[in-house]
């Protein structure tokens, strides 16, 4: 699935053999990055440096390990950290930024602890470029969950961790409200309400698993979203894929949902729609089990899942059914192992520690290897 030699570029740590410790902010360090997006194969690259509450940008795709970032958004300079730059919430601050994606000609970021999604209409090309649009809040100065209300709505969010833009539609994993929101077109005004909801019966509900046991429609902790091509795309189009980390599963819709609370077609990681245990109730994982899967991406006929708490990536190809086992593995020696960095004292170019986010651009898979405070650029092995 990925090149067996390991990551071609490592960003964020001095070397692949360094001990993992919290790092002070600089142009080369990261602290628990949870998302990254390579806009084109030549760059730019944007990273959600989550623990430092900032976004880091590279003008071109990095060519050497620990290459320093060119831009920072969210802090006054590369040496600073703190939620909302230790001040008030603005169009150029973030608090626990997580999901990040190309969005039209610009960029979208799930600014999780500000309970909002930020949209730049054009790609930022400087430090602290302010966002143009905010979703989940009425304006850029607000940051309360669900706009300070106990009930949610189509224009509110609570801990949104995932965002993706696909074929003109914007999708957000509104994680704390246990749902996925969709906008039919790229929003143009602040606080624009979503058009469709998955995981809940309507826009006002927010109970985990809809207030009952898990079903093909319910969610507990949706985190990341991608689209996986079908074998017959001209007939079926893309499949929607959502990681439901709280239910230790990945949900797949065979076609793009068109109705609120539409049930998924298949789950991976569980044998039934109503089972939810991590690693299917046993200590060690298998090729068919998951433990808090946070990230997901698709490239060609591959679906790649960050099985986060098992510190590994799993790969599926082509067609899947409920509980289909993975056919590819990265980060562990076998499907029954789950140690951080494969139980090695130091991270290596092939190891992972709590990988949170994955994205793909061309032949390059970008992995937010959060527990190792680094981002990996790793080539596919077609």
Regions found by a protein language model. Give the residues of each.
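Surface-exposed loop and turn segments in beta-propeller and other repeat-based domains
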Residues: 3-26, 69-90, 130-153, 193-216, ...
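Signature of short aromatic-glycine-proline-rich micro-motifs recurring in repeat-based ectodomains
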Residues: 22-38, 86-103, 147-165, 211-232, ...
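Conserved beta-propeller blade signature
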Residues: 44-47, 106-109, 169-172, 233-234, ...
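Short loop/turn segments immediately following the C-termini of beta-strands
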Residues: 50-51, 60, 112-113, 122, ...
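Structural signal for beta-propeller blades
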Residues: 53-55, 115-117, 179-180, 248-250, ...
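Short loop/turn segments immediately following beta-strands, especially the blade-tip
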Residues: 58-66, 120-129, 183-192, 253-265, ...
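Loop/turn-rich, solvent-exposed surfaces of beta-rich toroidal or solenoidal domains
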Residues: 294-317
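Blade-level signature of beta-propeller repeat domains, shared across WD40, Kelch, NHL, RCC1
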Residues: 311, 354-382
């Amino acid at each position: 699935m990925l090149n067996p030699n390991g990551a071609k570029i490592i960003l964020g740590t001095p070397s692949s053999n360094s001990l993992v410790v919290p790092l002070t902010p600089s142009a080369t360090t990261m602290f628990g990055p949870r998302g990254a997006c390579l806009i084109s194969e030549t760059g730019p690259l944007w990273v959600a440096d989550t623990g430092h509450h900032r976004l880091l940008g590279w003008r071109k795709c990095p060519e050497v390990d620990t290459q320093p970032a060119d831009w920072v958004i969210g802090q006054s300079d590369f040496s600073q950290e703190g939620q909302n730059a230790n001040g008030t919430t603005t169009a150029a601050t973030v608090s626990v930024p997580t999901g990040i994606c190309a969005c039209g000609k610009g960029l979208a970021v799930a600014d999780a602890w500000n309970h909002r999604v930020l949209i730049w209409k054009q790609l930022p090309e400087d430090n602290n470029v302010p966002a143009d649009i905010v979703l989940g809040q009425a304006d850029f100065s607000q940051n309360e969950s669900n706009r300070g209300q106990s009930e949610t709505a189509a224009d509110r969010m609570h801990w949104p961790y995932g965002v993706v833009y696909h074929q003109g539609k914007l999708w957000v994993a509104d994680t704390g409200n246990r749902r996925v929101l969709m906008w039919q077109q790229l929003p143009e005004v602040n606080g624009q309400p979503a058009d469709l909801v998955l995981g809940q019966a309507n826009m006002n509900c927010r109970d985990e698993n809809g207030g009952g046991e898990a079903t093909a429609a319910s969610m507990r902790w949706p985190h990341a979203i991608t689209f996986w091509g079908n074998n017959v795309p001209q007939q079926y189009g893309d499949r929607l894929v959502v990681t439901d980390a709280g239910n230790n599963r990945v949900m797949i819709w065979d076609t793009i949902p068109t109705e609120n609370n539409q049930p998924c077609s298949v789950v991976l990681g569980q044998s039934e729609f109503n089972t939810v245990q991590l690693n299917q109730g046993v200590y060690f994982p298998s090729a068919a089990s998951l433990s808090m899967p946070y990230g997901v991406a698709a490239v060609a006929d591959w679906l790649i899942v960050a099985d986060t708490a098992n510190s590994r990536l799993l790969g599926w190809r082509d067609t899947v059914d409920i509980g289909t086992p993975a056919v590819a593995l990265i980060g562990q020696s076998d499907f029954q192992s789950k140690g951080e960095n494969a139980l090695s004292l130091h991270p290596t170019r092939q190891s992972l520690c709590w990988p949170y986010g994955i994205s793909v651009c061309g032949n390059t898979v970008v992995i937010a290897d959060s527990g190792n405070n680094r981002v990996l650029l790793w080539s596919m092995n077609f």
